[in-house]
Amino acid sequence: MKMQWKIGNVEIPNPFVLAPMAGVTDLAFRRLCKEQGAGLICMEMVSAKAISFHNKNTEALMEIDPGEHPVSMQLFGNEPDLMAEVAKSIEERPFDILDINMGCPVPKVVNNGEGSALLKDRFPSAPLYSYYEKRSPWH
């Protein structure tokens, strides 16, 4: 059985992925999971708005240990312009993968039109994804 796999050009050594969980996947927990063999570490979702406001708590969420790699960072929001701007502003950070949260079911997130709310209509996230993909540094 082949254990190694890839997302784009990022090699992941095994199939064990630490899911992004708000309030759980802080730096200490991620280190512990990496020590226990996680192949890909996913940070908890980070608000594009909070990054744009230079929120101190958000800065702490984005801290990455050099031993965590490969590591994925997850943005959430619903404003294509802002998300593209934030993606560009953080491209020098040491994460290997950047993704958009489209699955969070928490009412506080969904009621703001973020997370799984991006999937409520048939193709509501297509324009957001297309816009973001074209303007992100990784297209």
Residue positions per predicted region:
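Flavin-dependent oxidoreductase catalytic cores
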Residues: 1-139
